[in-house]
């Protein structure tokens, strides 16, 4: 059920099936007979590069993705927690510990079984377990993207290195590839399987499968260059096994393999068709049987999660409950988000590939490009028929898109970087600009955008730790105090128990359970708890909180004389009506509303963190604010806020003084200490007037570094006002 635990397993399987030495030589024979892509106009002298060891490339990618995984500080999709880490936490520690996993659709239970041996109740290791394994999976995906490009364009072609550069410098890859999403694992499995697919079957220039001669010698060689019957069957078997795993994980992945299998069926001989059908049945039934058995062991009953996936999203149309998108979403938003600055080159690559003449399509490399382009169009086209769309649904296509993007990228930038001709300067500047844009987008989305949803959970852990280590309460001496938290946010706005970790943190959040098994009339009027709150916050708080808006607690539960909470985290989370918590967490958009309802209560701001500069959901805009009942914490936060404000103002004054020193006439320099004090006094006076009058037009000083006698409010002199505006 946990994506991160599946990630723990897959690298071992993949690395055991193909060692780095065999991988580096797997393309040698085929590449020696294949020229670079005919779709590129790169001169032959520029189409070759030096050979680099595959193991060295993988080590670089592994280090790069490990840095990538450890640098993630932001929230992307609830599924990266509620369909991976949360179910794993529940499996490891039991339902009573408050994990809130999404088990409606279910993922193969082997994921949770693997992860439960990693998690530890003593330390928040769950926060550090997934990055290394996610980095390994992402690095494998990058490596096999490069390998597929080498297969298509030649081992030493610039196009292969361009494909590697595209995947390494992709903002989407940096933002998404190391997350605990099932789509990330699906993408890695898909690109590895594409490397094992018998592309030669759909190319008329490739000899058909020959009768088996020496099974022992050929079955051990799984390289793509070997056309022996035994080697092709072994390679196909591995490919279909991985493809079946990807389809079990995400049933929509079958669209990729239906397209490739259809082309192979129509363009291959009957013997190859027989082999294909036999292996599809063999691998499909084997993987399906294993999945059903594992699910039976985990759930305790016979179930088939992929069927539930289709029933949930297609038959009951419950996917629409989580959002409805335009039919052109994947064309106008999906591809631009996946490709960012590479989108123009991708469009050129797709056009070139699909406009190839019939005579060139039969060649091996062009045939592979054509099939990759076909599946890159087929999958979004079919998924566009479903109302609910997300860019991550087409994420498995990104490696193939990078392979197709490489030739136009090389054609455009290679002459600019390999020649010193000044005529190529605009292209060089364009390359630098695109790199800067990619780096900026990657850093912002992975470090800053939606970072508050993770930071607030760290704050709650710190508060619980503080109450545990400094416990002076007379009501429970020698024991750790339990704190309570309530999240007045849209559902699944933050991770849950996998990040709260401490079972002494009791928390509840607004829910949004889908209307499963309801009739159509019932679905039409169904409103979940989160929507009920945002539709009418006042009524919701009166009817769904203990005591309503009239009887609110005056001090936190850990300072109250009543007995500490005896209920489990799960029971506290599911209790209705909700208890007023020690800590109330919400987005800044809701602050004015709560101020009007709770202004006479003991709640006050005790922490705030930056979350986003913008958000497509208006309910999630602004900072994340924490109100608490503890007056000591409120006073400490006010004191810290004032201190930061004063430090910021002092810094502003220093900048103003420095600016005045630089702009002052030479005959009155250097300034003595009295001049500096005069300027600082003037700056303070100006700031007070700005805050009081709300305008800078009256905050003016003529030649402030001359003497205090000329400190005048002259509306005609705008010098200092302009400086003040520029500095702020």
UniProtKB/Swiss-Prot annotation:
The chain crosses the membrane at residues 52-72, 246-266, 274-294, 330-350, 366-386, 393-413, 429-449. GO terms for biological process: GPI anchor biosynthetic process. It is an enzyme of class 2 (transferase). It is found in: Endoplasmic reticulum membrane. The keyword Transmembrane helix applies. GO terms for molecular function: alpha-1,2-mannosyltransferase activity. Residues 12-46 have a biased composition (Low complexity). Glycans are attached at residue 365. Residues 1-46 are annotated as: Disordered. Keywords: Endoplasmic reticulum, Glycoprotein, Glycosyltransferase, GPI-anchor biosynthesis, Membrane, Transferase, Transmembrane, Transmembrane helix. One of its GO terms (cellular component) is endoplasmic reticulum membrane. It is a multi-pass membrane protein. Its main location: endoplasmic reticulum. Pathway: Glycolipid biosynthesis; glycosylphosphatidylinositol-anchor biosynthesis. Belongs to the glycosyltransferase 22 family. PIGB subfamily. Mannosyltransferase involved in glycosylphosphatidylinositol-anchor biosynthesis. Transfers the third mannose to Man2-GlcN-acyl-PI during GPI precursor assembly. This is GPI mannosyltransferase 3. The gene is gpi10.
């Amino acid at each position: 059920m946990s994506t991160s635990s599946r990630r723990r397993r897959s690298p071992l399987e993949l690395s055991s099936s193909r060692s780095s030495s065999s991988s580096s030589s797997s393309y040698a024979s085929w590449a020696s007979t294949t020229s670079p892509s005919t779709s590129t106009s790169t001169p032959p002298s520029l189409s070759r590069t030096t050979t680099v060891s595959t193991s060295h490339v993988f080590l670089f990618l592994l280090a790069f993705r490990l840095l990538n995984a450890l640098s993630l500080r932001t929230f992307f999709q609830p599924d990266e927690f509620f369909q991976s880490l949360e179910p794993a936490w529940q499996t490891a520690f039991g339902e009573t510990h408050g994990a809130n996993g999404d088990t409606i659709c279910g993922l193969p239970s082997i994921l949770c079984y693997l992860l439960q041996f990693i998690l530890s109740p003593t330390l928040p290791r769950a926060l550090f377990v997934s990055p290394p394994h996610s980095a390994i999976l992402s690095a494998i995906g990058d490596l096999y993207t490069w390998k597929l490009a080498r297969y298509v364009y030649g081992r030493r072609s610039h196009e292969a290195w361009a494909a590697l550069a595209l995947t390494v410098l992709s903002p989407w890859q940096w933002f998404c590839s190391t997350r605990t999403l099932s789509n990330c694992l699906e993408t890695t499995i898909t690109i590895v399987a594409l490397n094992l697919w018998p592309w030669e079957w759909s190319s008329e220039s490739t000899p058909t499968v020959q009768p088996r001669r020496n099974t022992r010698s050929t079955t051990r060689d799984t390289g793509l260059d070997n056309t022996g019957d035994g080697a092709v069957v072994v390679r196909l078997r591995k490919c279909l096994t991985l493809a079946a795993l990807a389809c079990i994980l995400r049933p929509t992945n079958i669209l990729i393999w239906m397209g490739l299998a259809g082309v192979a069926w129509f363009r291959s001989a009957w013997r190859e068709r027989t082999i294909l059908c036999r292996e599809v049945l063999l691998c499909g039934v084997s993987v399906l049987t294993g999945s059903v058995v594992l699910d039976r062991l985990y759930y305790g009953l016979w179930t088939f999660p992929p069927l539930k996936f289709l029933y949930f999203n297609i038959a009951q149309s419950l996917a629409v409950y989580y959002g409805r998108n335009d039919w052109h979403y994947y064309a106008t938003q999906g591809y631009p988000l996946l490709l960012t600055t590479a989108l123009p080159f991708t469009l050129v690559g797709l056009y070139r590939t699909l406009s190839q003449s019939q005579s060139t399509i039969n060649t091996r490399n062009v045939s592979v490009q054509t099939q990759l382009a076909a599946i890159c169009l087929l999958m979004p086209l079919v998924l566009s028929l479903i109302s609910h769309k997300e860019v991550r649904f087409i994420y498995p296509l990104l490696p193939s898109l990078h392979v197709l993007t490489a030739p136009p990228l090389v054609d455009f930038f290679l002459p600019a970087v390999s020649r010193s001709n000044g005529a190529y300067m605009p292209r060089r500047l364009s390359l630098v600009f695109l790199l800067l844009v990619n780096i900026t987008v990657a850093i912002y989305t992975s470090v800053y955008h939606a970072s508050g949803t993770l930071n607030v959970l760290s704050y709650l852990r710190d508060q619980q730790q503080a109450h545990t280590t400094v416990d002076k309460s007379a009501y429970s001496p020698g024991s750790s105090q339990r704190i309570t938290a309530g999240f007045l946010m849209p559902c699944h706005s933050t991770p849950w128990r996998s990040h709260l970790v401490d079972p002494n943190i009791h928390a509840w959040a607004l829910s949004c359970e889908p209307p499963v098994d309801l009739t159509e009339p019932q679905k039409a009027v169904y409103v979940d708890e989160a929507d009920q709150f945002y539709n009418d916050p006042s009524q919701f708080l009166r009817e769904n909180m203990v005591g309503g808006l009239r009887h609110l607690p005056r001090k936190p539960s850990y300072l109250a004389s009543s007995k500490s909470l005896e209920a489990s985290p799960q029971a506290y989370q599911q209790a209705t009506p909700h208890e007023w918590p020690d800590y109330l967490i919400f987005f800044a958009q809701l602050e004015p509303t709560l101020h009007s309802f709770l202004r006479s209560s003991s709640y006050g701001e005790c922490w705030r963190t930056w979350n986003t500069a913008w958000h497509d959901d208006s309910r999630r805009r602004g900072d994340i604010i924490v109100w608490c009942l503890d007056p000591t914490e409120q006073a400490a936060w006010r004191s810290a806020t004032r201190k930061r404000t004063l430090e910021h103002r002092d810094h502003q004054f220093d900048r103003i003084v420095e600016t005045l020193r630089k702009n002052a006439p030479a005959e009155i320099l250097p300034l003595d200490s009295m001049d500096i004090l005069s300027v600082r006094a003037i700056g303070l006076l100006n700031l007070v007037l700005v805050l009081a009058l709300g305008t800078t037009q009256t905050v003016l000083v003529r030649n402030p570094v001359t003497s205090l006698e000329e400190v005048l409010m002259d509306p005609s002199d705008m010098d200092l006002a302009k400086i003040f505006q520029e500095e702020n």
